[in-house]
């Protein structure tokens, strides 16, 4: 059975407006695009104000965890130690580290040091040293809502990288 929203029903987006005054014209255009073979996003990708508020709660944990990392990161720290910090702080704030065991990923955070572009796996043997740059990518599940953010850190004194030849992407 197909459920169709009525023109005078509340809009599916949660705005409180009638469907005909909110998303009806948009949905009609999307249906035409779908019939022409274009990929069209589902309504569940568009979040209600209540869902956005819950996502923001998850984001607050990410920010707190990254702030903790910023306070403690220094030369001599292993990326495995960063993983422990992230795991413990995320759980302490009531969250779940989203990367842990996702499609076999073995850690609670991604740590990408220097030339590693993204999704580096923390390791006890990877010790941060003066001049390294590291991206710490934190993803949190809180009350069923996901958030993802990262921060780049310069370890020790900032170093000029102008002497390096960086790859060019065409």
Model-predicted regions and their roles:
Residues 68-101:
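Extended boundary segments
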Residues 102-115:
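Short, basic/aromatic beta-hairpin or loop at an interaction surface
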Residues 147-161:
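Short, compositionally biased
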Residues 47, 112-145:
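Acidic/histidine-enriched ion/cofactor-binding microenvironments in catalytic or ligand-binding pockets
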Residues 1-45:
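Acidic/negatively charged segments and metal-coordination signatures
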Residues 162-168:
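Conserved small/polar residues in nucleotide/adenosyl-binding loops
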């Amino acid at each position: 059975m197909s459920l169709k929203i009525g023109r005078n029903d509340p809009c599916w987006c949660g705005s409180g407006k009638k469907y005909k005054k909110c998303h009806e014209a948009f949905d009609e255009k999307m249906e035409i695009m779908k019939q022409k073979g274009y990929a069209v996003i589902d309504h569940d990708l568009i979040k209600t104000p209540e869902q956005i508020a819950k996502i923001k709660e998850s984001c607050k944990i990410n920010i707190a965890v990254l702030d903790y990392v910023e306070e403690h990161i220094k030369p001599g720290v292993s990326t495995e130690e960063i993983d422990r910090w992230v795991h413990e702080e995320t759980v302490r704030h009531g969250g779940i580290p989203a990367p842990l065991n996702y499609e076999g990923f073995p850690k609670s955070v991604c740590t990408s040091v220097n030339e590693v572009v993204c999704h580096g796996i923390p390791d006890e043997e990877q010790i941060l040293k003066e001049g390294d740059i590291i991206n710490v990518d934190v993803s949190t599940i809180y009350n069923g809502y996901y958030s993802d953010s990262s921060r780049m850190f310069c370890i020790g004194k900032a170093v000029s990288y102008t002497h390096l030849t960086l790859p060019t992407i065409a």
